[in-house]
Regions:
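Class I S-adenosyl-L-methionine-dependent methyltransferase catalytic core
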Residues: 1-141
Length: 141
């Protein structure tokens, strides 16, 4: 699941690498137009579930419908500090499958690490690509 889908590139990458289904959520109508166009260009629309909702509402709906995820990718706009709340809701609603992972893309790795200290997650990898930092998380024990 790509919670802040933007162009849909991450969800499309998941699908191109064999994921059975990719949820791509973004609250921006403009972003969703790009996601739809990009998914059509790649001919992967059959397995793409595109949702135009705020992340909080989408996570609530996923819980209500019993949907769980193996991989959850979070790349909220860098100027919004909402990863901590998204992770909190994902854990609270039990949306991560056993052995599932959360990947956070951020421009401020130290802030995200500090934010995650209160969760039941452990950082098992992190990588830096230019300005972007990727933090890979899994539930402890």
């Amino acid at each position: 699941m790509d919670l802040f889908a933007g162009s849909g590139a991450i969800g499309i990458e998941f699908l191109s690498r064999g994921c059975k289904r990719a949820y791509m959520c973004d609250k921006s109508h403009e972003a969703i137009k790009f996601v739809i166009a990009n998914v059509k260009k790649t001919k992967l629309e059959e397995n793409a579930i595109i949702i135009n909702k705020d992340y909080i509402q989408f996570l609530k709906d996923a819980e209500k419908n019993g949907i769980k995820f193996d991989i959850i990718f979070l790349d909220p706009p860098y100027d919004l500090d909402i990863s901590k709340n998204a992770v909190k809701l994902i854990l609270e609603y039990g949306l991560l499958n056993e052995n599932g992972i959360i990947i956070i893309e951020t421009d401020e790795k130290e802030r995200e690490i500090e934010n995650l200290k209160t969760t039941n997650l452990e950082i098992y990898d992190s990588r830096k690509y230019g300005r972007a930092n990727l933090i890979f998380l899994a539930e402890r024990g």
